[in-house]
């Protein structure tokens, strides 16, 4: 199963896509099919799996890391610093996904009926959000 998650800067999961049964899918393709309606003033901090989001959705504020150029050219100091700042913002969503995967029903093979997967992942997302809200 593959879902995409969005989280705010506190780590609360604010959006989750429905699962796809068709096997391997690229993150950006799932994003284009299930794009959340984010306000125009909200920045989307994404990883390199979403190359093309700035071109396809110019009205949306999005932040991608800078990709290393072809050949043996290293990034400049400014580009490395930008990527470091981007990673500090991005780690919040990675930690949210990690919290989800602590529940074995999400991280391992789903052994129930597939039609129940979205409900189960919604429940786990709610539990993760509940724990975060009670620890703040």
Regions from the language model: what does each represent?
Residues 1-136:
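Short, well-ordered secondary-structure "scaffold" segments embedded in the functional core
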């Amino acid at each position: 199963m593959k879902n995409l998650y969005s989280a705010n800067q506190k780590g609360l999961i604010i959006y989750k896509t429905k699962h796809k049964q068709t096997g391997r899918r690229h993150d950006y393709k799932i994003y284009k099919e299930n794009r959340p309606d984010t306000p125009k003033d909200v920045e989307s901090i994404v990883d390199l799996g979403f190359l093309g989001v700035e071109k396809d959705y110019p009205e949306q504020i999005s932040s991608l890391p800078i990709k290393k150029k072809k050949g043996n050219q290293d990034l400049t100091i400014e580009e490395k610093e930008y990527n470091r700042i981007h990673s500090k913002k991005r780690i919040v969503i990675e930690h949210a996904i990690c919290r989800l995967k602590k529940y074995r029903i999400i991280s391992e093979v789903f052994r129930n009926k597939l039609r129940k997967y979205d409900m189960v992942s919604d429940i786990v997302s709610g539990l993760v959000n509940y724990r975060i809200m009670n620890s703040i």
